[in-house]
Structures are given as C-alpha cells and as structure tokens.
Regions:
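Structural signature of hydrophobic alpha-helical transmembrane segments
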Residues: 93-105, 124, 170-183
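N-terminal chloroplast transit peptides
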Residues: 1-32, 37-40
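Short, highly charged, low-complexity non-transmembrane loops/tails of multi-pass membrane proteins
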Residues: 252-284
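Cytoplasmic-side transmembrane-helix entry/capping segments in multi-pass membrane proteins
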Residues: 101, 121-124, 139-152, 175-179, ...
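C-terminal ends of transmembrane helices
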Residues: 110-122, 127-139, 189-199
C-alpha cells in the first residue's frame, strides 16, 4: 500500500507562518462593532424628556460650566468680604470690600443672565434672551429675578457714587436703612437658592433660602452685633458649600428638560396638538 505525501503549500504561502494561514485576520464584523462603539462614544448623550428625546451639546456644557464658575465667583467674593469685615483693619476693608462687592454682584448677574446669539428660522430672525442655566420653565419668574438683580445693582452703584469715601458694605453696616437699596440683589440670591433647593433638595440651598433674608432682616431690625456676625458667617459658609457642590452634580441636571423649552417655543395650536398626542400615548391609544 502506497503512502500519499501531504499536499504542498501553495507557492504564495511559502515562508509564511502556519498560524497566519489558519487565522489570516480578525473577522470584519468585530472591527465593525468596534467602529460603531467608537462612534457611539463620540455622539452627544441622549436623554428622555417630557416631550421627546434631547441631547447634551457642547454649548450646553459650556453654559453649565460658566454658570457654576459664576456661582463660585459669587461665593468667593462674599467670603472675602465677610473675612475683611470681621477680621480686617480699616485699610484692609478699604482695599477689599468694594472689589469683593463688585465680584459678588457680577458673579450673581453672570449666573442669572445670558443673551444668546440670534437664530435664523426661515426668513425671520429672533433674538432669544433668558436666564442662563437657571433653567426655569416659568418666564415671568425668570424676569422677576433679573429685575431684582438689576434694581439691587443700581442701588449699589448709587451708594458707591454718593459715598465715595467708604466701601458700600461699610456704609450699609452703619446705615441699616441702606439695606433697602442693595436688598434686591440678595432677594435674587434667595430666589436662586429656592430654585436650587426645590430642584435638587440640597440642604445648603434650603438653608440659604432662610439664612439670606435673616441676615438682612437682622440688620434692619437692629439685631445685636454678635448675631449679625454669626449670620454673616453662616451665609458665607453655606454659599461656599453650595457653589462647590455644584461641581459634583451631573451636567444635565443644570440644563433641565430641553424638550420642555422646545415645546414652549411652539405656537399654542401646536402645543395643544402635542399635548393631545402625548395624552393618547400615556393612555395606550
């Protein structure tokens, strides 16, 4: 019986490792899956909203980071002013208080205001102006908070020009009735604290909602100096915790449900139609 010799390798394969011939390459489907996974990672995250899905864009991220940075500027400025008022001498107070006051007012204003660039829709252009990342769905409340901040800022500027020989904070400390001029700024901060506390339930936001008015009312009512100092320290600490903890929250938390904003931008007839469709879906029709 003759033994057959094993078949020779093709000429093109001579000199190549046998394992390379057995498994020439990874299956194309594996590479395709990896490409799809990489593409999915590069796409903006999608969230389910009340009126449909929405995505977190780069502009959204930039706005949230700007909002949180503005809150930290507000907190740092208030802390610096409180430290100068409680621990600094007259020279330090002259150097720090007005600068810190400007920083605090600017920080709160930056957290409340944003004028977005014009968006062209068809043949018309409309300018969208609203609160920044304080994404509140009731526009009159937004405008009211803006108006409070603006009124308090005007009061601060008026005090600075009429009493140029001393910082605004020093003048208010010795003239309690001046609280009525700067108070609207703190009222806007109180409203912001209420929004944050209602949305996220953070204890420092809830505490700020009560501590800030208590500080102003204590000054108006002529509270003892020790009580005023204690309230000042409490507000400074709460603001610091509030501003720093914002960095630990998910970015989409400060955006809100973008599908609601898109819905509110629709004409009333379209809003009603969408509501009817949503109600049918919820009922299973």
């Amino acid at each position: 019986m003759l033994l057959k010799s094993p078949p020779a390798w093709p000429a093109v394969s001579r000199g190549l490792p046998r394992a390379r011939l057995v498994c020439p390459s990874r299956p194309p489907t594996l590479r395709l899956r990896r490409l799809r996974a990489a593409a999915a990672l590069s796409e903006p995250p999608t969230f389910a909203g009340r009126y449909g899905k929405w995505t977190l864009t780069d502009n959204d991220r930039a706005e949230v980071l700007a909002y949180r940075a503005a809150l930290n500027l507000l907190a740092f400025s208030f802390d610096a002013a409180a430290a100068a008022a409680l621990l600094g001498d007259e020279t330090t107070q002259q150097q720090v208080l007005n600068v810190a006051s400007v920083g605090g007012v600017v920080g709160l204003g930056a957290a409340l205001f944003l004028v977005r660039s014009a968006k062209r829709r068809g043949a018309r252009t409309e300018l969208l102006s609203h609160l920044v990342q304080v994404h509140m769905y009731v526009t009159p409340i937004k405008r009211f908070m803006q108006a409070l901040w603006l009124a308090g800022t005007v009061g601060c500027v008026a005090l600075a020009f009429t009493n140029a020989d001393m910082p605004v904070a020093t003048y208010v400390a010795s003239h309690p009735q001046a609280v009525w001029l700067i108070g609207p700024v703190f009222a806007a901060l109180t409203g912001l604290s209420f929004k944050e506390g209602a949305c996220y339930g953070t204890p420092e936001s809830v505490a700020l909602f009560f501590a800030v008015p208590a500080l102003l009312l204590g000054k108006l009512a002529g509270a003892p100096d020790d009580v005023e100092k204690l309230l000042l320290v409490v507000v400074a600490l709460l603001l610091s915790v509030f501003a720093l903890r914002k960095w630990t929250q998910p970015l989409q938390a400060d955006i809100g449900d973008k599908s609601i904003f898109d819905f509110m931008a629709l004409p009333p007839d379209e809003q009603q139609r969408r509501e009817v469709e949503l109600e049918k879906l919820e009922r299973g029709f």
